[in-house]
């Protein structure tokens, strides 16, 4: 069984206000084990990255100025994820941003099965604090 662990970084929190994807990272799993196959790319955007977002991911407009736009990596991304299940922490956020980028390109929304690890972590840990930084510290 093939699954893809996926994460994005963005210019801000609201795609409806024009925020965009600036980084995508994917890791392939077969039967829940990493194969070592990954896909990672940065995206140039004209939108200014929010200061709060920079504090989270450290990516700046200056760094991204030499990167291609999402459009140039979209097919490579879709070929990598295929129709396999996507494992995403706080999936609504990432999926909405990805679908927004795909929509800008005239492509259909993702149809992949989505496994959201955020509610799983909250249930397992019996805690509202379950962002990725916390989980990484908790599980080393």
Predicted regions and their residues:
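Conserved non-catalytic scaffold segment of RNase H-like nuclease domains
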Residues: 1-112, 125-140
């Amino acid at each position: 069984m093939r699954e893809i662990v996926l994460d994005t970084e963005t210019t801000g929190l609201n795609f409806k206000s024009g925020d965009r994807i600036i980084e995508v990272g994917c890791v392939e799993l077969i039967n829940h084990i990493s194969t070592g196959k990954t896909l990672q790319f940065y995206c140039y955007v004209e939108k200014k990255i929010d200061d709060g977002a920079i504090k989270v991911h450290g990516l700046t407009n200056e760094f991204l100025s030499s990167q291609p736009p999402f459009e140039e990596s979209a097919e490579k991304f879709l070929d990598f994820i295929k129709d396999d299940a996507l494992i995403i922490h706080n999936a609504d956020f990432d999926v909405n941003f990805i679908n927004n980028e795909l929509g800008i390109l005239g492509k259909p929304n993702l149809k992949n099965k989505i496994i959201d690890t955020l509610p799983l972590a909250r249930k397992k840990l019996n805690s509202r604090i379950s962002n990725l930084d916390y989980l990484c510290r908790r599980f080393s």
